[in-house]
């Protein structure tokens, strides 16, 4: 059969693997760990859905009979005894559904946060750090400078109020969810001094202007980069 079975989750090595990945149909992660992977740990295929194994019904190929996945023990249809060449999920409890691109965007945001935190801590004792960062930008960051879409998640920003950040250095716009994620990480790491560079283009230039939660144009002091926006974030979460 198409499944890759394991007696324990290949990620945490503790829980039993109770979910099935779509479309590869591999069975090697517990439900908790399945939310932290974007590719199947066994075949590296992009995951588009995660199902509870016990609930899954599949249509076998080529006979097209529908059977419960947990009842399949060999590469033969239990109804017609014909050899199976594949299977497709037709029913089951879907625990998660996503596009692989969403996970790549999340990874991109996570990398930006890590780089910002690392640079903020290293700024005082590594003078060559900024040059290395500026010229070591991954190519994935290029060609995404659009005022109507977030440069991190690439989702369209339909309302002006959603343009939380607009960087004068590169005109890049970051949507409110991505901006909040960056700020939340900075607050958790207790980094409240100026950020060392623009989160998008890595230019060593503070944000010149931005929009607050009400969509009003802001004019922070020219050297207020992180401190200003961390305070804005704290106001935002305190008002929720």
Swiss-Prot record:
Q: What GO molecular-function term can you cite, just one?
A: zinc ion binding
Q: Which residues form the signal peptide?
A: none
Q: Which cysteines are joined by disulfide bonds?
A: none
Organism phylogeny:
Viruses, Duplodnaviria, Heunggongvirae, Peploviricota, Herviviricetes
List the InterPro entries hit by this protein, alphabetically: Znf_RING, Znf_RING/FYVE/PHD
Instruction: Recite the UniProt keywords alphabetically.
Output: Metal-binding, Repeat, Zinc, Zinc-finger
Question: What is the protein's name according to its record?
Answer: Putative RING finger protein ORF96
Q: Where does this protein come from, organism-wise?
A: Ostreid herpesvirus 1 (isolate France)
Zinc finger regions (RING-type), where? 9-44, 150-202
